[in-house]
Amino acid sequence: MENHPQIRLVAGLGNPGSEYMATRHNIGFMVVDQLAAQFGSTWEKSVPQAREDALSAKCGAVLLIKPMSFMNRSGYPLFAVAQFYKIEPQQILIILDDLALPLGRLRLRARGGPGGHNGLESIIVQFGTEEIPRLRVGIGQAPREGYVDYVLSRFFDEEKPLVRSTIGRAVDALKCAIDNGLVSAMNTFNKTETEEA
């Protein structure tokens, strides 16, 4: 684990289109947008000849990706981009929303199953491995019924300050993983506020 490969690609998951902008399910897009903005990067089509759309931006030597194929098909464009740039699954860091985590909580993992997330499941199926690092961003627990409506809803006004600070911490976690390695980022950002106190 200490010798985890250098991260070369960071992919934020979400749904394209203005109707999905700023929804809970699109927190992955929000995080990579913030990271791209910090580096003054602009989004452009990543692999012109690819059949599946994705937008890309540069963050130093790291490629940022937003799959434009809708969440449940995220694996197709991401796999095409990784093949084009010869990037291994262990060199990719996925950012996704997580219903099981409280709003504001981050959880970095080097591997694992999809945990009920269709976007991550699509990626695992396309790459044929669960050895893909991921940063799960808590969006709060949905009501027992209607979780689809919940993940496609926008954050409440009273949640927005916490959402902004969470996006900032997620960007810091990504930069730490890129600069210092995945293990260092996990040790720093997987702690809860009570553990840090």
Give the residues covered by each predicted segment.
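Nucleotide and nucleotide-moiety/phosphate-recognizing core
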Residues: 1-111, 121-135, 142-146, 161-196
